Amino acid sequence: MAVQQNKKTPSKRGMHRSHDFLVAPQLSVEPTTGETHMRHHISPNGFYRGRKVLKTKNDE
């Protein structure tokens, strides 16, 4: 079984874990409706990059 030879300092421990953080999702604002949505995803009402790309139940 592997056993460390020397204790890892708090600084080295932090450097080792430097990329283990959680990233908040990138959000965009839809220009036509002003709704917030995740990047590269359609908004809840069916708009993507200013165009209607999906029919929703509320559409006539």
UniProtKB/Swiss-Prot annotation:
GO terms for cellular component: large ribosomal subunit. The keyword RNA-binding does not apply. Residues 49-60 have a biased composition (Basic residues). Keywords: Ribonucleoprotein, Ribosomal protein. Residues 1-60 are annotated as: Disordered. SUPFAM superfamilies: Zn-binding ribosomal proteins (SSF57829). The keyword Metal-binding does not apply. Pfam families: Ribosomal_L32p. InterPro entries: Ribosomal_bL32, Ribosomal_bL32_bact, Ribosomal_zn-bd. It comes from the Bacteria. One of its GO terms (biological process) is translation. One of its GO terms (molecular function) is structural constituent of ribosome. HAMAP family: Ribosomal_bL32. Belongs to the bacterial ribosomal protein bL32 family. PANTHER family: 50S RIBOSOMAL PROTEIN L32 (PTHR35534), LARGE RIBOSOMAL SUBUNIT PROTEIN BL32 (PTHR35534:SF1). This is Large ribosomal subunit protein bL32. It comes from Janthinobacterium sp. (strain Marseille) (Minibacterium massiliensis).
